[in-house]
């Protein structure tokens, strides 16, 4: 080593992101006995999308007792659908309870990561310094980078402009003429929250969403006491919420015509609040319910009926000074513009900063559409996996269930590397990646997302659905329980003979093959009741004691996107 050079820090695993995916990965690593890891977070605190999205009314549209880790149940959720403050507090408690703080590197945005084929490790450049890692777990999530549309004249607009995921709390909306661009999951929360205080609110709607009422309420003190003292009541509540959603899946994936009854209920819900037939016609979708995410709100339609709220059933075409011009030619003078136009879901910006074994970026490898083996590993990117990867999203349930399934896969992947021993990498075979994705896309053909007659953020530039999982969470759990080494090439440092892949013997289901001496999966990984967010709850995985009370603040109003996070909708 030359004078002036320094030895870069090396870790076994580098986790990117500290939302549900990143913190969940960190907990699972500790449970697997792995402490040589870091969590690289670009912001100055943990929380992911629940840190970034703090707009008025921000909340989750999956019930709180299902939208939480099975290994960290919280008996003190304040509401059926808890607000952003409570969810963010829950994630902070997870970081504290499981002793994760010492692993987390705040203000360490990843600038570039490159695979070193000679040393079989990842070289990572961050805003806080460089390091290397044997394995990278990318948990940046699909709802991390806001998408701003290119609108002619936007740069010259003299008023205030911001995205819902970058809410400017210093800007006072009171008495202002405000434009809301988009009618997705963020917008239906923001509109009811700000309508009473603004002078005039103009909502630009390109495509109307289907909206169902939200059955939200405060969780009583008696219920919370029962969940603390009798954990089976909490488990039963979670199990019921999960089971109902599993039973709904077939209507979305196999028999979309069954959704007609739900459409009738949605129309009746609209009619109760919107008496004007002209406005009601503008708000009625022309596509099958479920094709886009079904939104939940009991406040959105009443807000649209307010005298100071206008609906423009057209997209925003251009801006001339302070005048917004819609595609239908209508003009509206505005003081502030709020964009609720979603995120870079199928074109994640971090993909430009991941360079694989062949010198190509992940963005280049995915230029014709994202695809990953079991939603986790990509061909050409050894020892790299993603949490909430391609085709792992859900249309009606909790993304936390999918995250925990992927953590099972991550844990077995690391066990296999440990059993192989030495400096080694697992590289997803292109044939296995293609076979998996053909299987997923074949199942996608009958789903409402592909046949419902809409264009949604689930689809990529080629019109392929690379976002949603076309099955139940139980099916995905089974598909990701084990790593099938037949789907991987085992790579050694050059000059050493590679170890042959282990193929499942006759009679053993794919994915069940084990190398001699491989450890069984940690049975604690997906069982509820491990750590409890309540007074006196015991922690595990080497964490410190659990903070009393848990995430009990902030009920919040409105409903946000489900398991996937917040603000999924487009204009």
Give the positions of each predicted feature.
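FAD-binding beta-loop-beta segment adjacent to the flavin cofactor pocket
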Residues: 51-60, 152-153, 299-301, 356-383, ...
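Rossmann-like dinucleotide-binding core of oxidoreductases
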Residues: 5-10, 14-16, 20, 24-45, ...
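Feature captures the FAD/FMN-dependent oxidoreductase FAD-binding
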Residues: 79-143
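C-terminal catalytic lobe of FAD-dependent flavoproteins
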Residues: 250, 254-258, 262-327, 332-353, ...
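C-terminal, flexible cofactor-proximal segment of oxidoreductases
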Residues: 210-213, 223-224, 231-232, 372, ...
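Glycine/threonine-rich phosphate-binding loop and adjacent beta-strand/alpha-helix elements that clamp
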Residues: 340-414
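Long, intrinsically disordered low-complexity tandem-repeat segments
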Residues: 508-509, 525-567
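Beta1-alpha1 glycine-rich phosphate/pyrophosphate-binding loop at the start
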Residues: 3-5, 11-15, 20-104, 205-206, ...
């Amino acid at each position: 080593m030359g004078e002036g050079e320094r030895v870069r820090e090396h870790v076994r695993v580098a986790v990117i992101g500290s939302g549900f995916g990143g913190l969940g990965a960190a907990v699972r690593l500790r449970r697997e006995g792995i402490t040589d890891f870091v969590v690289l977070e670009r912001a100055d605190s943990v929380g992911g999308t629940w840190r970034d999205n703090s707009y008025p009314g921000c909340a989750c549209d999956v019930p709180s007792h299902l939208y939480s880790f099975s290994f960290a149940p919280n008996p003190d959720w304040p509401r059926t659908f808890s607000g952003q403050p409570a969810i963010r507090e829950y994630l902070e408690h997870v970081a504290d309870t499981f002793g994760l703080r010492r692993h987390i590197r705040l203000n360490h945005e990843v600038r570039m990561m490159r695979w070193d084929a000679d040393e079989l490790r990842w070289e990572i450049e961050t805003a806080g310094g460089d390091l290397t890692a044997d394995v990278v777990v990318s948990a940046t999530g699909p709802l991390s980078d806001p998408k701003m549309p290119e609108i002619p004249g936007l740069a010259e607009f003299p008023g205030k402009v911001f995205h819902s995921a970058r809410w400017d709390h210093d800007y006072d909306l009171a008495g202002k003429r405000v434009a809301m661009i988009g009618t997705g999951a963020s917008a239906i929360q923001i509109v009811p929250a700000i309508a009473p205080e603004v002078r005039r609110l103009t909502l630009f709607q390109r495509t109307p969403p289907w909206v169902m009422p939200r059955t939200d309420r405060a969780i009583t003190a008696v219920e919370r006491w029962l969940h603390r003292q009798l954990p089976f009541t909490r488990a039963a509540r979670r199990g019921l919420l999960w089971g109902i959603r599993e039973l709904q899946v077939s209507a979305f994936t196999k028999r979309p015509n069954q959704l007609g009854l739900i459409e009738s209920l949605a129309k009746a819900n609209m009619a109760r609040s919107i008496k004007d037939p002209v406005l009601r016609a503008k708000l009625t979708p022309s596509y099958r319910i479920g094709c886009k995410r079904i939104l939940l709100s009991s406040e959105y339609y009443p807000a649209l009926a307010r005298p100071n709220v206008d609906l423009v059933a057209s997209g925003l075409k251009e801006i001339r000074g302070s005048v917004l011009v819609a595609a239908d030619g209508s003009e509206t003078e505005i003081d502030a513009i709020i964009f609720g136009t979603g995120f870079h879901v199928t074109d994640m910006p971090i993909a430009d900063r991941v360079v694989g074994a062949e010198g190509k970026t992940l963005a280049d490898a995915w230029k014709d559409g994202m695809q990953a083996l079991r939603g986790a590993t990509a061909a050409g990117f050894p020892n790299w996996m993603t949490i909430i990867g391609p085709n792992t999203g859900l249309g009606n349930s909790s993304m936390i269930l999918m995250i925990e399934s992927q953590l099972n896969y991550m844990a077995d992947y690391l066990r296999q590397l440990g059993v192989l021993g030495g400096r080694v990498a697992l590289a997803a075979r292109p044939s296995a990646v293609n076979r998996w994705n053909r299987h997923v896309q074949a199942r996608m053909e009958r789903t409402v997302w592909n046949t419902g007659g809409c264009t949604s953020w689930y689809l990529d530039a080629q019109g392929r659905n690379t976002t949603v999982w076309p099955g139940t969470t139980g099916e995905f759990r089974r598909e990701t329980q084990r790593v099938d080494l037949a789907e991987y090439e085992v790579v050694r440092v050059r000059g050493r003979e590679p170890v042959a892949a282990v193929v499942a013997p006759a009679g053993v289901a794919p994915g069940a093959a084990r190398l001699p001496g491989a450890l069984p999966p940690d049975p604690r990984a997906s069982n509820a009741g491990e750590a409890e967010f309540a007074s006196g709850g015991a922690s595990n995985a080497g964490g410190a004691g659990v903070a009393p009370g848990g995430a009990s603040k902030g009920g919040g109003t409105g409903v946000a996107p489900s398991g996937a996070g917040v603000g999924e909708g487009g204009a």
